[in-house]
Design a protein with these regions (language model features):
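Conserved ABC ATPase "signature" region
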Residues: 71, 86-104, 129
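Catalytic Walker B motif of ABC-type/P-loop ATPase nucleotide-binding domains
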Residues: 133-137, 142
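Conserved ABC ATPase signature
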Residues: 82-83, 108-112, 116
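The feature captures the beta-strand-to-loop junction immediately N-terminal to the Walker
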Residues: 7-9
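Helix-to-loop junction immediately C-terminal to a conserved catalytic motif
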Residues: 22
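Hydrophobic anchor residue at the start of the ABC signature
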Residues: 122, 150
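Conserved ABC transporter NBD signature motif
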Residues: 30-38, 47
Length: 170
């Protein structure tokens, strides 16, 4: 697996490129391929089984608990209306532990700091268990300790990582 860094100044299109890769935007020209298949011809669920995203900004219109947010990462592996099972909860608990947020599982997402929210979103991506991980400025809201933790974690993952990042020292 490899780590691909997208580097550039503010406004250079890093996030726009990533949004094309993770289907928020459709390219004006050309196409994005994933495993040899044009991304926009795949179902959203199929592409979500292959890549997880940690976006720069994450908003929820409802106040979910941390555990509920991370459980959303399991959705691509489920049939319609299939309930979460013991294996899902085990995966979620492990993901929360990996990002040092296990003690926050029952807190609501909106009560967390920006850095804590970013770590929960990373846990959601880990719970998704995909071969590729897209990171859009993943260290934006993190203090230096958690920036280093995140980058060390990313290095250990056996997945392809595409990341836009500002700080080349991390």
């Amino acid at each position: 697996k490899e780590l691909v860094g997208i580097i550039g100044p503010n406004g250079s299109g890093k996030s726009t490129l990533l949004k094309c890769i993770y289907r928020i935007l459709k390219p004006d020209a050309g196409a994005v391929y994933l495993d040899g298949e044009e991304l926009h011809s795949m179902s959203v669920k199929s592409s979500a089984r292959k890549m997880a995203v940690v976006a720069q900004h994450n908003y929820y219109n409802f106040d979910f608990t941390v555990r509920e947010v991370v459980l959303m990462g399991r959705a691509p592996h489920k049939k319609t209306l299939e309930r979460d099972n013991a294996k899902d909860y085990q995966i979620v608990d492990e993901a929360l532990k990996t990002v040092q947020m296990e003690t926050f599982a029952d807190r609501t997402f909106s009560t967390l700091s920006g850095g804590e929210q970013q770590r929960v979103i990373l846990a959601r991506a880990l719970a998704q268990q995909t071969p590729a991980l897209i990171l859009d400025e993943p260290t934006n809201h993190l203090d230096i300790t958690h920036q280093i933790m995140l980058m060390e974690l990313v290095k250990k993952l056996n997945v392809t990582v595409i990341s836009a990042i500002h700080d080349l020292n991390i």
